[in-house]
Amino acid sequence: MPYAVLGATGNCGTALIQNLLQSSTSKVHAYCRDRRKLLYLLPHLADNKQVDIFDGSIHDLPLITECVRNCHAVFLVISTNDNVPQCRMALDTATAVIQALRILHGEGASMPKLVLLSSATLDDQLSQNTAPWVRWILLKSASQVYQDLSQAEAFLRQQQDWISTIFIKPGGLSVDVQRGHRLSLTEEKSPLSYLDLAAAMIEAADDPDGRYDLRNVGVAYTDGPARFPRGAPMCIFMGLVRHFLPFLHPYLPATGPNQGFLC
């Protein structure tokens, strides 16, 4: 069963590939900008017949079309930990995928399910256990990223008459081992490991009843939290600087992705 992972070199992308390859029947279409980087992160992919790598620009429509062709689900996980001014990663990815799917739809192909990685911070229900002042800080520290995600979500919801999307919204994320997860429509529990997040995204995509289609879906850990992402404080601080003083962005350090971050 083919799955496309757009953003294969990120923490979530590599975790998705690792989880998917646990099944001998899974086929992975891994999209990235840099094949060498992906093979550096996951060297065993070089001779893995379950994986096809598609490297190039997200604006390369023929490339993206072939990447998502015949897929059961497409995971949209291209993002950044940095509060980049005028960030468009999520919206550009969603737009490229929809353009590709329109071509395939015109050919009579069956449509995949889309799974967008978003954030619990954007959802009042899923953020119910987050202190208001903490949520305010998070919203400001990733304001550009969240605006991009909100626009991508709105765009994908406009396609709901012909494409189903699941909006996965975790809380804090950390590079850690897999501990177990639980999908929820009412809460998130974090910090959560990327491996648990990836397993949750696959479970939601594979749900035979479509219970998570067009829903905001939280993820909770089930066997204890992941370790606290040590890069989170610096990520948040630099995000606040970029929010209030965006002209400083070119001079500020990157804060990820390997350190983990808070969504």
Curated annotation (Swiss-Prot):
Keyword Oxidoreductase (UniProt): yes
Principal EC category: oxidoreductase
Pathway(s) where this gene product acts: Secondary metabolite biosynthesis
GO molecular-function term, one example from the UniProt record: monooxygenase activity
Tissue: Specifically expressed in conidia.
InterPro entries: NAD(P)-bd_dom, NAD(P)-bd_dom_sf
Enzyme Commission (EC) number: 1.-.-.-
Highest taxon in the source lineage: Eukaryota
Transferase as UniProt keyword: no
GO BP terms: secondary metabolite biosynthetic process
SUPFAM superfamilies attached to this UniProt entry: NAD(P)-binding Rossmann-fold domains
Alphabetically ordered keywords of this record: Monooxygenase, Oxidoreductase
The family this protein is said to belong to: Belongs to the avfA family.
Function recorded in the entry: Oxidoreductase; part of the gene cluster that mediates the biosynthesis of trypacidin, a mycotoxin with antiprotozoal activity and that plays a role in the infection process. The pathway begins with the synthesis of atrochrysone thioester by the polyketide synthase (PKS) tpcC. The atrochrysone carboxyl ACP thioesterase tpcB then breaks the thioester bond and releases the atrochrysone carboxylic acid from tpcC. The decarboxylase tpcK converts atrochrysone carboxylic acid to atrochrysone which is further reduced into emodin anthrone.
Name assigned to this protein: Oxidoreductase tpcG
